[in-house]
């Protein structure tokens, strides 16, 4: 695999050189137009935007006219014939094709406009830098903006644009002009590719180029950032450049969800926002009950900042809108926590005992017995600190490896000897934990149930039940009891499994923090707390139980989607990052996004030293402390220390405090001081300790004095699983040709070294006669670490790819149901629902069964005669028209009742006592609608139909999501039957969706046929 990657990298670099040559040709055209634009007046420069828009409109006019003509042909009425239904389908297909042609035509004209449009943006930036004020003739947008923007003022038909404005409370004087490399980056973004630009190369300014160009179509450009601060900052910082040209700019994170102002933000030409908010707005839009409440426009073009963080690091976690289930705190966590904790402590006690024994055995020369006991400790708790330290000592790692190799022979045939004394076994590479037979027996005894882990064969019990000579009602009661018991037991087993995960795989101050009696997740990529996010599948509740904090109510997902599937819905997608090259293969295969590495504006002079490897963590940390003291005290340089967890950042800080070295700590606990800490981080002699800085958008400024001293020094305390995160840390120094340095300190006890067997380097240290405090460095170490990181990246890619296969199934279902729901918002779907139901009815069954099925759905007898049924000809067509007829009779009956209520209401209004009876009723929803739209009784009935359909879509969809999650979980067991779980999942998911959609249609129609206006109203 690594050999294949080397070939891919070779061709990628070759291709990149060709891409850069092509970009330089376009760059020359931009510079040609820049020469012309210098001669333009301010008004002439501004009028170029209107000229561009006219050209786009002229090119697409005929296509839009054709589209509008087809839209007029669509048939929207309460009753629609089957022929009209098919006609609508053909028209909609043709409209979709025209929309695609419009997009292609717009892309074609935008590509033609690109050199001149980019030149306009650069010339605008230049004029803002070189002039304190730019005076132009006022237009309509100027008048609107003058009410809320301090940087422009109106005087006698003229607008004065100042080059001074504020963002995030800071005042700035515009001083930026696009470099040539930034223009190249802008071209790549417009092409729908990823521009890899090193940290400090001005990606925020680069984005203004494709933003301006693509906003000319009027369809909206979304600029996606990884956090709220960046979304607000960038929108305020860059807005005047676009607003000067008549484009509107806004940020969704400034406003509350579902608000009028957020809707207006989406109507802007350019909309900034965080990835999560864009996704949640999409999900919320598919839960509204009126078109007036829709927030987002059609997804057109998105530019994602830190695209690798959004589409790769966060791709595995779906975003979920859920509702708390009242009173549904899972009591099993309280019931089972103490039992799992007891089991965990028993194993810890046992491992401590046999570890001491194994150490004595190995020291005395009994390597066989000592190796077996050492391997037991490794299988039972691989992160056990005394074990890690012992393995770093002479020959001990070799003893463990030899023992492991022996027991893994013949497909782990003898592994039961090792595991027989353990309660659970941890696989650190796969990050999994499983109960051993001893652990299963322990929990079963604690629960006083020898079959605790065995689920009953419910299918067999149902068969046995049918043979019993009892009434149908009794059978139904027993059946419900069996189902309830089955799910209760299944839930207890699941709870035990989640609790053991919480105790063995998740660590406080690494994976999560406990703040204000709540468990808060720490983002491993950024070191930030992820607010309002919880681990799924009961794991978060297990952690709450473990930490003895309040266990929050369980919740039911109402809507869910992954970032991957949301962003793939945009017509065009592009992104920027300083670290995309390492994930090139994934971007191509999953998103069809090419990566182009943009050259730096100035040569990089940063010194990147080889990694330094120590035997133990203690030796490593001592060396790090000494290096920090030397750099900050002797060389007076600012030092940024990058750590992988809150725990390590606090350890380094305490060690420095003991030596009276002042330091600032930036982690999930101190994130509120972030702005101050970053501002201080570039000053002479300042030491800053931070958890992973990837994706933070931090710009550590250094003075000319610090540049002379050697610039910002980066010290890494450990290599991350991903090379990208390491590169993000390194990228904090050496920006725009500034001096700087980076150095990583490692030990054989680090997770990366242990899990991937790199701690076997200890044998090399032994052969070299390594002494305490000495270290290894050089190409061998760096290459070995890079290979290990590549293995992890490949493994993570495989996991994400597999997860995407699963999510693609429900994604197709989601797209279908959301389209169906959007139609339900806009048109009357009753005829379509009747058609869907009739189409699914089996006309090949016996007449009695056929008639019973019809009655169960429509509650109407004698819909089809026996003779008509026998003929079979056009039976479904006849059925469709007959049901529609009854449906309209039903509507007219309701309508006549409402007419009676209307006249009655006039009388009620004269008498307050009688009016109170009218207002409070079972059918309060109908009355509320009626009071709003009393003059349009047909609209009341149509609204009732719409609300019924939308209610059942939402209600049944959330149940379907839950069922799909269960199916995903249980399909994994098919691997024991030598079957591919994904194939089983796809087959069953198809059946599950068909049943869901059939029931949705059936329930909607049945409800309308049976609902009544309460007689108490009359």
From Swiss-Prot:
Molecular function GO terms recorded: ATP binding; protein-exporting ATPase activity
UniProt GO BP: intracellular protein transmembrane transport; protein import; protein targeting; protein transport by the Sec complex
Keyword Plastid attached: no
UniProt membrane topology term: Peripheral membrane protein
Major subcellular location class: membrane
Pfam families associated with the record: P-loop_SecA, SecA_DEAD, SecA_PP_bind, SecA_SW
Protein task: Part of the Sec protein translocase complex. Interacts with the SecYEG preprotein conducting channel. Has a central role in coupling the hydrolysis of ATP to the transfer of proteins into and across the cell membrane, serving as an ATP-driven molecular motor driving the stepwise translocation of polypeptide chains across the membrane.
Subunit structure: Monomer and homodimer. Part of the essential Sec protein translocation apparatus which comprises SecA, SecYEG and auxiliary proteins SecDF. Other proteins may also be involved.
Stated name of the protein: Protein translocase subunit SecA
Gene for this chain: secA
């Amino acid at each position: 695999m690594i050999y294949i990657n080397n070939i891919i990298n070779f061709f990628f670099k070759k291709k990149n050189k060709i891409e850069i040559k092509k970009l330089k040709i376009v760059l020359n055209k931009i510079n040609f137009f820049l020469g012309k634009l210098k001669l333009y007046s301010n008004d002439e420069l501004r009028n170029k935007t209107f000229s561009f828009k006219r050209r786009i409109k002229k090119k697409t006019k005929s296509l839009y006219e054709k589209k509008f003509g087809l839209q007029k042909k669509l048939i929207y009425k309460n009753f629609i014939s089957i022929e009209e239904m098919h006609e609508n389908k053909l028209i909609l297909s043709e409209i979709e094709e025209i929309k695609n042609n419009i997009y292609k035509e717009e892309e074609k004209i935008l590509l033609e406009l690109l050199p001149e449009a980019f030149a306009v943006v650069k010339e605008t930036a230049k004029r803002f830098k070189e002039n304190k004020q730019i005076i132009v003739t006022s237009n309509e947008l100027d008048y609107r903006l003058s009410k809320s923007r301090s940087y422009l003022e109106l005087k006698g038909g003229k607008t004065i644009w100042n080059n001074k404005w504020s963002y995030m409370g800071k005042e700035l004087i515009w001083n930026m002009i696009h470099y040539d490399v930034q223009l190249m980056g802008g071209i790549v973004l417009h092409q729908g590719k990823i521009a890899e630009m090193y940290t400090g190369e001005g990606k925020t300014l680069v984005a203004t180029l494709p933003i301006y160009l693509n906003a000319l179509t009027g369809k909206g450009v979304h600029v996606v950032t990884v956090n709220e601060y960046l979304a607000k900052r960038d929108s305020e910082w860059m807005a005047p450049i676009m607003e000067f040209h008549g484009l509107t700019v806004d940020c969704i994170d400034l406003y509350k969800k579902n608000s009028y102002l957020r809707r207006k933000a989406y109507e802007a030409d350019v909309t900034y926002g965080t990835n999560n908010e864009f996704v949640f707005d999409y999900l919320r839009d598919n839960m509204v009950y009126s078109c007036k409440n829709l927030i987002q426009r059609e997804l057109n073009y998105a530019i994602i900042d830190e695209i690798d963080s959004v589409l790769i690091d966060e791709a595995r976690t779906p975003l979920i809108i859920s509702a708390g289930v009242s009173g549904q705190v899972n009591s099993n966590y309280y019931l089972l926590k103490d039992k799992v904790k007891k089991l965990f402590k028993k194993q810890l006690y046992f491992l401590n005992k046999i570890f001491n024994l194994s150490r004595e055995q190995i020291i005395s020369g009994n390597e066989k017995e000592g190796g077996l006991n050492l391997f037991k400790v490794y299988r039972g708790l691989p992160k056990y600190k005394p074990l890690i330290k012992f393995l770093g000592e002479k020959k001990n790692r070799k003893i463990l490896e030899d023992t492991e190799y022996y027991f893994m022979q013949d497909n782990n045939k003898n592994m039961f000897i090792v595991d027989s004394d353990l309660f659970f076994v941890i696989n650190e590479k796969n990050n999994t934990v499983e109960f051993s037979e001893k652990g299963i027996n322990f929990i079963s005894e604690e629960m006083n149930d020898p079959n605790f882990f065995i689920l009953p064969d419910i299918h067999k019990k149902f068969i046995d039940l049918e043979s019993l000579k009892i009434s149908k009602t009794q059978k139904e009661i027993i059946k419900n009891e069996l189902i309830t018991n089955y799910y209760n037991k299944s839930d207890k087993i699941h709870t035990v499994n989640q609790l053991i995960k919480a105790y063995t795989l998740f660590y406080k101050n690494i994976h999560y923090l406990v703040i204000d009696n709540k468990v808060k997740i720490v983002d491993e990529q950024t070191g930030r707390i992820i607010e309002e996010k919880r681990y799924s599948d009961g794991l978060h509740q297990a952690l709450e139980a473990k930490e003895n904090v309040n266990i929050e109510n369980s919740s039911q997902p109402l809507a869910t989607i992954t970032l991957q599937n949301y962003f793939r819905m945009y017509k065009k997608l592009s992104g920027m990052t300083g670290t995309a090259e390492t994930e090139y293969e994934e971007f191509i295969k999953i998103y069809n996004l090419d990566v182009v590495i943009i050259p730096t504006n100035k040569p990089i002079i940063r010194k990147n030293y080889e990694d330094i490897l120590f035997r133990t963590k203690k030796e490593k940390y001592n060396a790090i402390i000494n290096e920090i003291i030397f750099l900050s005290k002797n060389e007076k340089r600012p030092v940024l220390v990058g750590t992988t967890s809150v725990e390590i950042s606090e350890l380094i800080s305490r060690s420095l405090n003991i030596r009276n070295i002042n330091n600032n700590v930036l982690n999930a606990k101190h994130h509120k001081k972030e702005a101050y800490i970053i501002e201080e981080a570039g000053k002479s002699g300042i030491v800053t300790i931070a958890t992973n800085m990837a994706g933070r958008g931090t710009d550590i400024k250094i003075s000319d004095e610090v540049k002379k001293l050697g610039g910002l020094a980066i010290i890494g305390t450990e290599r991350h699983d991903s090379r990208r995160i390491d590169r993000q840390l390194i990228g904090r120094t050496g920006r725009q040709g500034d001096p700087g340095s980076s150095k990583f300190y490692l030990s054989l006890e680090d997770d990366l070294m242990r899990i991937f067997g790199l701690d076997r380097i200890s044998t090399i240290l032994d052969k070299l006669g390594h002494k305490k405090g000495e270290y290894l460095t050089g190409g061998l170490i760096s290459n070995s670490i890079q290979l290990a990181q590549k293995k992890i990246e490949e493994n993570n890619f495989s996991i994400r790819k597999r997860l995407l296969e699963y999510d693609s199934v429900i994604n197709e279902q989601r797209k279908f149901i959301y389209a169906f729901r959007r139609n339900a918002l806009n048109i009357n779907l009753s005829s379509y629902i009747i058609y869907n139901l009739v189409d699914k009815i089996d006309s090949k069954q016996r007449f009695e069964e056929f008639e019973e099925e019809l009655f169960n759905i429509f509650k109407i007898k004698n819909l089809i005669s026996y003779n008509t049924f026998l003929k079979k000809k056009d039976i479904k067509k006849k059925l469709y028209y007959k049901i529609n007829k009854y449906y309209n009779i039903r509507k007219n009956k309701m309508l006549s009742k409402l007419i009676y209520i209307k006249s009655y209401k006039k009388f009620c209004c004269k008498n307050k006592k009688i009016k109170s009876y009218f207002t409070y009723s079972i059918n309060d929803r109908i009355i509320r609608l009626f009071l709003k739209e009393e003059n349009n009784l047909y609209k009341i009935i149509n609204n009732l139909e719409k609300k019924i359909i939308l209610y059942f879509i939402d209600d049944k969809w959330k149940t379907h999501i839950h069922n799909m999650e269960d199916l995903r979980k249980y399909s994994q067991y098919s691997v024991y039957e030598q079957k591919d779980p994904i194939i089983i999942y796809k087959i069953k998911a198809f059946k599950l969706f068909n049943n869901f959609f059939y029931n949705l249609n059936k329930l909607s129609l049945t409800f309308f046929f049976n609902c009544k206006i309460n007689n108490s109203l009359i």
